[in-house]
Every structure is written in C-alpha cells, then in structure tokens.
Regions:
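Active-site loop/oxyanion-hole signature of alpha/beta-hydrolase fold enzymes
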Residues: 7, 32, 44-87
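Structural signature of beta-strand start/N-cap positions in the alpha/beta core
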Residues: 16, 42, 82-85, 106-109
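Short, hydrophobic alpha-helix immediately C-terminal to the catalytic nucleophile
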Residues: 31, 72, 97-101
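Catalytic nucleophile serine of serine hydrolases
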Residues: 54, 90, 114
Length: 146
C-alpha cells in the first residue's frame, strides 16, 4: 500500500513522532505544529494513499486497520524506524489507535485527537424521547410568529 511521509528534524537521534492526517487532508496539515515539535522529536508527517504525495492503488484495502498496518510496515521497512510515538486527528486518530493495536511493540504512545469511528452505537439517552417533541415545539414557536 503506498504511504508517503515528509520528515522534519533537527536531530535524527530524537524519538520519532508519526503524524496521521484525517480524511481529505494530507501530511502538510501539520506544518504549523512541526516547529514546536522539532525540539523533542523527529517528525514524520504521513500522506495516506490518495492524499498528498501518496498514490492510490484501487485494489488496496483502505480500512483503518489496513492503513495502520501499512504505516507501521512503511516506517519499519522503508524509513528504518522501529519505535515511534503516533498522533492523528479524525480518521488519523482512529488509524493511530489501530497502529497501537496491530503493532504494540513498535508504538510507544498514541495521541488520538477527535478520533473517528468510535461510536458504533448511539450512547444511551439520559432524557425521555417525549422531551424532544416538547423542546422542538418550544423552539419552533419563535419561527412561527407572524
């Protein structure tokens, strides 16, 4: 699976931080944060397949777990980074969590910012459904005045 990264560093001895963007974005989304991270990390901003500089192969699996495995494989085989911290937002947050699940020996920590995909069911209701109708009726009064 084609994954691409942009490396930013002041010191290659700093621990690796892999940044995973959300759907429809690219690794460049992290550029404004990179300068603050360079003092402590070598930063790898990932381009997911079909985003940024990474091509899309239509026959590849694109689910979060497959993408997570592809990023770990890419970092270990092509970049020669065995241990990494990972952070991601939205879909990238979900992929980051999956990276820790598929490669716990490689992922040192995860920061998932507003990760997608966590609600497979709606949370339990705290208020009775009948209250919805009363609230909507009250709100609609302000729009129905003539």
């Amino acid at each position: 699976m084609p994954v691409h990264s942009h490396r930013y560093t002041q010191d290659l001895n700093n621990p690796a931080l892999v940044l995973v963007h959300g759907l429809g974005s690219a690794g460049s989304i992290w550029k404004s944060l990179v300068p603050q991270l360079l003092e402590n990390f070598t930063v790898y901003a990932i381009d997911l397949p079909g985003h940024g500089d990474a091509p899309l192969n239509k026959d590849e699996e694109m689910d979060p777990r497959s993408l997570a495995q592809a990023i770990v494989d890419y970092m270990v085989s092509e970049v020669q980074v065995e241990k990494m911290h990972v952070a991601g937002n939205s879909l990238g947050g979900w992929i980051s969590l999956e990276m820790a699940a598929v490669a716990p020996d490689n992922v040192l920590s995860v920061t998932a910012l507003a990760p997608a995909g966590l609600w497979h069911e709606l949370p339990p209701r705290k208020l009775p459904p009948s209250l919805d109708a009363r609230i909507l009726a009250k709100i609609s009064q302000y729009f129905m005045k003539t």
